[in-house]
Amino acid sequence: MKELKRYRFFFILLIGLIILTFINQSLGWSALQLTGNSILDMLFLLPPVLIFVGLLDQWVKKETLMKYMGEKSGIYGILFSLLLGGIAAGPLYIAFPIAALLLKKGASIRYIVFFLGVWTTAKLPIIVYEFSSFGTTFTLIHIGFGLVFFYVMGLIFERFYDQGQLLRYDVTEEM
């Protein structure tokens, strides 16, 4: 019964999709096709990232990561987060396993939040697209405000959350 409760949201969405298909067949099939394409995208994107996370876990020593992204890393933490998030490719859900590994290895919460923010606003493909579509002024304002915002959010998160508390948190217990 606990396993069924854990997947209740999946079953609710599946039943909703079936009901939608009975009400409006073309819309239901379109939703099913979109869902299938999203699942396929995830299946192609996640395995390489999980392999990368596993290799990073084995190759990068905790002390090295703490030196560059730990509490006392200073400008190195900002630069490393900018580099790691800026050269990234793919949707944000790809960044979460990397962020969890960084947290486990001793990276500061401030730099993890900043890394996730850089991933969403200032990764290279987004910057190139914004420069070509929206121009220099918009892009620089958007990225500048985004980076400042996410760094400040990282400072706030660091004040309210303990690293050990986040490492012990298990989201599946709430399901």
Model-predicted regions and their roles:
Residues 1-44:
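Hydrophobic transmembrane alpha-helices of multi-pass solute/ion transporters
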Residues 72-74, 101-111, 132-136:
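Juxtamembrane helix-boundary/capping and inter-helix hinge elements in multi-pass membrane proteins
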Residues 7-11, 43, 47-48, 75-79, ...:
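Hydrophobic alpha-helical transmembrane segments
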